[in-house]
């Protein structure tokens, strides 16, 4: 089987699972679980435009579930409350992945 097809199938399954457990995983006090969720979202953002859109959908789903005003509130709240440098790094990496994966963004250096 083509490696790209396997990756696509894997990502589809990950997305389905991610949407099912996303809200409960981020409501836990276990930062290891939350760290893994943000690492998965980062990987989705960088992998493809569809993955980027799915990561934003997951944040939007969480926002609606928690009746928040902004979809990135969870990321900023976690960043402010993070106690370890490792977790802060994962959160900042996720923000970076969102920025570099934005289709309309053109950065000139």
Each model region followed by its residue ranges:
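Amphipathic alpha-helical repeat scaffolds
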Residues: 23, 76-80
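Elongated alpha-helical scaffolds that mediate protein-protein interactions in large eukaryotic proteins
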Residues: 1-69, 84-89, 100-109
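Charged, helical or coil segments that form electrostatic protein-protein
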Residues: 67-77
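Conserved C-terminal subdomain of P-loop nucleotide-binding cores
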Residues: 95-96
């Amino acid at each position: 089987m083509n490696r790209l097809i396997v990756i696509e199938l894997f990502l589809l399954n990950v997305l389905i699972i991610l949407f099912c457990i996303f809200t409960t995983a981020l409501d836990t006090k276990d930062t290891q679980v939350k760290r893994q969720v943000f690492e998965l979202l980062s990987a989705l953002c960088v992998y493809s435009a569809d993955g980027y859109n799915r990561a934003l959908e997951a944040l939007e789903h969480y926002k609606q579930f928690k009746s928040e005003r902004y979809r990135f509130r969870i990321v900023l709240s976690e960043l402010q409350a993070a106690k370890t440098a490792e977790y802060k790094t994962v959160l900042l990496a996720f923000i970076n992945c969102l920025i570099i994966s934005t289709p309309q963004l053109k950065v000139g250096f």
